[in-house]
Amino acid sequence: YFLMGFQLFASGSYEIFNFPVDARNLALHNSASAYDGILLNNNPASLSKRANGNTYSYFYLPANIHFTGFQNVHNSSSGVRANKISFMSYGAIIDGETEKKSYAYDILLESGVKKEIKNLTSVGLSAGYLFSSIAGYKSQLLYSNIGIRSRMLRKRLGVGLSLENIGFLLKSYTDV
């Protein structure tokens, strides 16, 4: 019953949050990982200290769906900082009655930080903004992800915990 409640809650989410941004996340079915990663993902505490630079992503899916993403990760003595922008276009939507064409898309901006504590535990926080438009109806929200990760047994075993998509809806699709 507990797991079913979470599945029902997640079914009303924005699709761009569930979309994997690289091949590794696609293989893991977009699940969070306690291992180091070079991209800002579900658990911001899993950002690698070795990550540095820019990453570009582009996916083309059936039904004319396009995903484009850009991430910048910077490593400094105070921790790891990451910024990302993502755009997902769901293509044209044609009204069956009026034959009017409209579009659906999501734009996501996110920034995150990770701090390592005694080379054993990492704490991460990310915050973002999402703008979504479907056939002229628009929605906006602010969200955050909080994560913690610990490495044990000479860094062979990783354990992580993340709270994801903690959000505040600024404007619903149905607000006029």
Per-region residue spans from a language model:
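Hydrophobic h-region of N-terminal signal peptides that target proteins for export
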Residues: 2-10
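Subset of outer-membrane beta-barrel
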Residues: 9-176
